[in-house]
Amino acid sequence: MTTKNRQIKNFTSNFGPQHPAAHGVSRSVLEMNGEVVERAEPHIGLLQRGTEKLIEYKTYLQALPYSDRSEYVSMMAQEHAHSSAVERLLNCEVPLRAQYIRVLFREITRISNHSLALTTHAMDVGASTPFLWAFEEREKLLEFYERVSGARMHASFIRPGGVAQDLPLGLCIDIDSFTQQFASRIDELEEMSTGNRIWKQRLVDIGTVTAQQAKDWGFSGVMLRGSGVCWDLRKAAPYDVHDQLDPDIPVGTRGDRYDRYCIRIEEMRQSVRIIVQCLNQMPSGMIKADDRKLCPPSRSRMKLSMESSIHHFEPYTEGFSVPAPSTYTAVEAPKGEFGVFLVSNGSNRPYRRKIRAPCFAHSQGLDSMSKHHMPADVVTIIGTQDIVSGEVDR
């Protein structure tokens, strides 16, 4: 009896971009040895819209809506990064009430983002009930968006110098009512997943990232804290009124998908805590900087005097000029450190606005995180990275 040596070749498989579990228009090429993934190569650029170039032809105020559409799940965090960069170049001081409103809605955005990320991640594993439960609560958060801006998603609410308008009557009461009942909703989600045997089998020790790997790849947010690195810009480099608030920063130990799940659950609890602190500490006062070149007057005041009409007309047509230096401003967005490198040449349009997108850094870890796992695990690894293609491709 003779034996023959046969060389087994790996084969490649396309995952996405049309696959519903690809979390957007993303494509990955998987090199597989049987049912084991040997290599996963993300192919980006399918949702590239030229955002950074388009902004160079807009005024600083007209550039704001592009921030909403860059990462369309946590919109106000991107608005805040752009507005803060402009304010830093202008050396503009934002009123205290506006700072509290900004923090309030950024934490509402964080809850909205995590509730979507966690429950779509659960659907990747095979659990559909948490998704339906969470969307009932997320609908309330989008209604809060709508009440302050008129839009459910692309709000353009956080603007250079402050916020677009003050909180409508009764909104703070409704937000407080939401915080009182949302903790029990988180408990229900945990009851479905945290101790579930199948859930833990699919998540524990899968997609592991060490602390050094997370630093080398430029991870931030939950992806960094899940690997045991306690780094949160709200604590490490406080902005707005974060130095007056007192949340806890959850940190993982193993760096696997289960740790990142637990951190997102706890971050929703801490966001509720921050929202309650903002509601209790928020003072009365102005919600825009007292600079009519930067912040136009309200429409009601515009009809009372010629000066108000002029001050309302100029910012929306010509815009305002920003001094020539450059600045880098970063905020702790729900997905990680979202940064804006803004270069001004002294005109009313940015010379360059470079976006530091956390999802772009996280996507490069897909190969290492997927190695020697099954194709079904690749789906959930993309889910635990919480990637949005619009932010990756810009």
Curated annotation (Swiss-Prot):
Region ranges (Disordered): 1-22
Keywords: Electron transport, Mitochondrion, NAD, Oxidoreductase, Respiratory chain, Translocase, Transport, Ubiquinone
Comp. bias intervals (Polar residues): 1-16
Chemical reaction(s) catalysed: a ubiquinone + NADH + 5 H(+)(in) = a ubiquinol + NAD(+) + 4 H(+)(out)
GO molecular function: NAD binding; NADH dehydrogenase (ubiquinone) activity; quinone binding
Record-level GO BP terms: mitochondrial electron transport, NADH to ubiquinone
Compartments (UniProt record): Mitochondrion
Gene3D superfamilies, alphabetized: Cytochrome-c3 Hydrogenase, chain B (1.10.645.10)
Disulphide-bridged cysteine pairs: none
Domain of life: Eukaryota
EC number: 7.1.1.2
Gene Ontology cellular-component terms listed: mitochondrion
InterPro entries on file: NADH_Q_OxRdtase_suD (IPR001135), NDH1_su_D/H (IPR022885), NiFe-Hase_large (IPR029014)
Main location: mitochondrion
Assembly and oligomerization: Complex I is composed of about 45 different subunits. This is a component of the iron-sulfur (IP) fragment of the enzyme.
Protein family membership: Belongs to the complex I 49 kDa subunit family.
Role this protein plays: Core subunit of the mitochondrial membrane respiratory chain NADH dehydrogenase (Complex I) that is believed to belong to the minimal assembly required for catalysis. Complex I functions in the transfer of electrons from NADH to the respiratory chain. The immediate electron acceptor for the enzyme is believed to be ubiquinone. Component of the iron-sulfur (IP) fragment of the enzyme.
NCBIfam families: NuoD, PRK06075.1
Protein name in UniProt: NADH dehydrogenase [ubiquinone] iron-sulfur protein 2
Naturally occurring in which organism (per UniProt): Nicotiana sylvestris
